[in-house]
């Protein structure tokens, strides 16, 4: 049986592969700074895409989407700003979510613009 950390890593690998099939380019995995962590940082054309990956084996507590709380969104936004500050240029960006339902043979749902900075 996989540990929670291994399942999370497997989900991130699955999400990265899925997004690469959709023609996004992987820039970084598990970007960390003092504000938090971003699972995947991708690029689609000229847009930097910050991706939160969620895997849930059941929908009992609202499923994967419900686990991206306002507090989590705030941490992701601060972390993304930190990432962008370290890179020259003015890049458009967005926040996506990839939701993987482990109880349905890794059914993948990609939510573009899952939330914004406001």
From Swiss-Prot:
It comes from the Bacteria. Transmembrane segments: none annotated. CDD domains: PoNe_Nuclease. Gene3D superfamilies: 3.40.1350.10. Pfam families: UPF0102. InterPro entries: Restrct_endonuc-II-like, tRNA_endonuc-like_dom_sf, UPF0102_YraN-like. GO terms for molecular function: nucleic acid binding. Belongs to the UPF0102 family. This is UPF0102 protein NE0719. It comes from Nitrosomonas europaea (strain ATCC 19718 / CIP 103999 / KCTC 2705 / NBRC 14298).
């Amino acid at each position: 049986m996989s540990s929670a950390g291994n399942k999370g890593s497997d989900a991130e690998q699955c999400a990265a592969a899925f997004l690469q099939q959709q023609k996004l380019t992987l820039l970084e995995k598990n970007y960390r700074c003092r504000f938090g962590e971003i699972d995947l940082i991708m690029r689609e054309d000229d847009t930097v895409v910050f991706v939160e990956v969620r895997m849930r084996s059941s929908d009992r507590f609202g499923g994967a989407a419900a686990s991206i709380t306002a507090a989590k969104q705030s941490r992701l936004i601060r972390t993304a700003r930190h990432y962008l500050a370290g890179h020259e240029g003015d890049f458009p960006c967005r926040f996506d979510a990839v939701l993987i339902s482990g109880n349905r043979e890794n059914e993948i749902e990609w939510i573009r613009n899952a939330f914004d900075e406001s």
